[in-house]
Amino acid sequence: MKSVAMKPPSDTSQDNASYHRQLAEELETRLDTVKEGGGAKAVERHHSRGKLLPRERINRILDAGSPFLELSALAAWDMYQEEGGVPSAGVVTGIGRVHGHECMFVANDATVKGGTYFPLTVKKHLRAQEIAFQNRLPCIYLVDSGGAFLPMQDEVFPDRDHFGRIFFNQARMSAAGIPQIAAVVGSCTAGGAYVPAMCDESVIVKGNGTIFLAGPPLVKAATGEDVTSEDLGGANVHTSQSGVADHFAETEEEAFAKVRDIVANLNWKTAAKRNTTPYEEPLHPAEEIYGILPKESTRVPFDVRDIITHIVDGSKFHEFKKRYGTTMVCCFAEHHRLHGR
């Protein structure tokens, strides 16, 4: 069926559109803010070490020109202000395509408190794993983390849905045949060390990549031994002696190429079959939605079908039980050629 949107009066439409465009601009501003990570100085220091930012790392792995669906970008917004804030909860998660396969990415942002885990960081990481588990998405972890944020460790470690659940999920997904892949692109200390160790296949970068439960200062305090990070848990140690990591990389770029090679050799079958029918643009531009939605959407009634026609392919949808339970609209439609409800 084709539905033609019923537009509200022009003065109301313009007022609504102005209001919602302002909300959209505020959202974009917030998204731009969190993408700055820990701030200009932290980013400069990060780059000076030859390290890329988490979103830059993800883009290096994705198929050229393919989209990345970032999840929970505003997690921990306006929280932990006493600690200076934790943009995006200090971790970037989302779904992207590698050799045509949708994969779940979890990338620590070391410019934000050294990539350490706050309570909301754990929650965001677990949410990404849950989505991956439900949809059988291979997981790619770009690890650059100092483990738990120690001043808040009592809120990070103890419960069944806290930090340890991350490793439990990795074990369950691996056992279920969902690939777990890691690129160690920075320090992996304490809890952060378990993520690559529990993956099915991992890559570690020479120099910046390290894996150990306790770093050189703690080793010195406990044993009196002076040891460098590289000798304690660097790329050479873990690829030639301990066997914790599987692949040695001279640079991050080489590491990301190896990650792509790993995905290419998974013999992985994507669950969803793609619809090859031609894509039809909606009959009505999405921009008009701003004018249809009332400013006070919980008080002013509007027909949600008008919104649907601006979103679905060809503005076509098949409504289900139209005369029953009329406060809810259920329908079948295609969105970018993907069939759904």
Model region roles, listed by residue range:
Residues 1-102:
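N-terminal amphipathic, basic-rich helices that act as targeting or association modules
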Residues 48-77, 281-317:
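Amphipathic alpha-helical
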Residues 74-104, 124, 133, 298-341:
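Non-catalytic terminal/interface segments that mediate subunit docking, oligomerization
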Residues 103-106, 114-117, 137-142, 175-188, ...:
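A short, small-residue-rich loop immediately preceding and capping a beta-strand
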Residues 111-120, 152-160:
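Flexible beta-alpha connector loops of hexameric P-loop NTPases
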Residues 112, 118-140, 146:
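A conserved hydrophobic secondary-structure block that centers on an alpha-helix together
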Residues 143-271:
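Conserved catalytic cores of soluble enzyme domains
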Residues 246-308:
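Terminal amphipathic helices with adjacent charged low-complexity linkers/tails
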